[in-house]
């Protein structure tokens, strides 16, 4: 469902007419070699497109106008090969709506000690050209990612590739919508938020449909489509064949088919449900939700559209990478001193992209919702480094709370627990990480990912100009408290 190849990134090289045609031709040739080399590297998720060397204010303004108007353009990469006076860039940068990366590099890796002359010096001027360009970004208070180093370095390419994935997620969020079936769970605070502000800052269009519309579509699903889907279930999962289970699984298959049709029709990228508003649905969507998350849709339970949007954004960032991303909830604790752990799960809706084993379809009673016993996928989660992230609405801005965690093996069987689960150690440790999370107001609903790291989420928050706080192995609680206080002042003074 998610295709990062549909996007492209424009590579903009700055110079000026002062240098003359011969030098400008060399600038273009060297830029072309850089872009060709980058495009040959499979680390990059999308094509990088070299645009003509920019030498005047009118050329710069025109290229940004075109970038803004092109839905395929997910971001722009700028590099000043020579000195490009930054007043020429003000009009273009002032209208730019795309995520921007400032690449500070040089065509040649090393100084040619024996042959260097003033021709070489005049051609290779990014050392001061990019400083001039950096000033105008800082002066205009523009969000941007800065990557420094030679363009052939692995670390440089990794940082560019991460940012490109983030930019794709931003573009994706600006073009689809989040579908809500019903409202938020009653009386819950952290799942609420300003949907108008979300569309302004994050690009997410969030709208609600009555669950009755979905229920009518479920009733109309043909039996042959259900049987085709059951064949797929048997191939991908461990599936029971008893009559009680098959009846419940068929109902989830109907919900999945109807949901997918509805989401495609609405150009949706994510959706929410709530157990308090099920109308004529036969079951709370479980297996159906897990399957759609597996395809790439974002999801939030109990009407949590912020979690749904974040899950989708991270799924876009992690497309094609090892690991997976899921809606998650901090459910219960293991509090053995020195080995405190968090068991993450939800009633039904954990994405199988984070499974370490072949998932099992199981049918069990569910005490909430008042509907028939729902089918769901059950599995243990993957092990290794992961992130937990939550968006909360602080009244005057959104705050992204991020915690680095280590997912650990589940060493004991839990035969009576009928839900998918993952066990993790928060960094730096349970007490400090959880204290910081609670101080920051992080939600009980999160996006959990083994596919990305913290840098992706920092890039995302900075590009969208929203607040973020990171809880990791370097956490100092007193400094963290100060950061929260300073952020209150900064974001309170900041004008949009």
Swiss-Prot record:
Its pathway is: Carbohydrate degradation; L-arabinose degradation via L-ribulose; D-xylulose 5-phosphate from L-arabinose (bacterial route): step 1/3
The record's similarity note reads: Belongs to the arabinose isomerase family.
The answer to keyword 4Fe-4S applying to this record is no
Q: What does this protein do?
A: Catalyzes the conversion of L-arabinose to L-ribulose.
Mind telling me which NCBIfam families this protein's record contains?
A: PRK02929.1
Query: Does the record bear Cell cycle in its keywords?
Result: no
- Name the record gives this protein: L-arabinose isomerase
Binding positions (Mn(2+)): 302, 329, 346, 445
The UniProt entry, under CDD domains, shows: L-arabinose_isomerase (cd03557)
The cofactors required by this protein are: Mn(2+)
Task: Identify the enzyme class.
Answer: isomerase
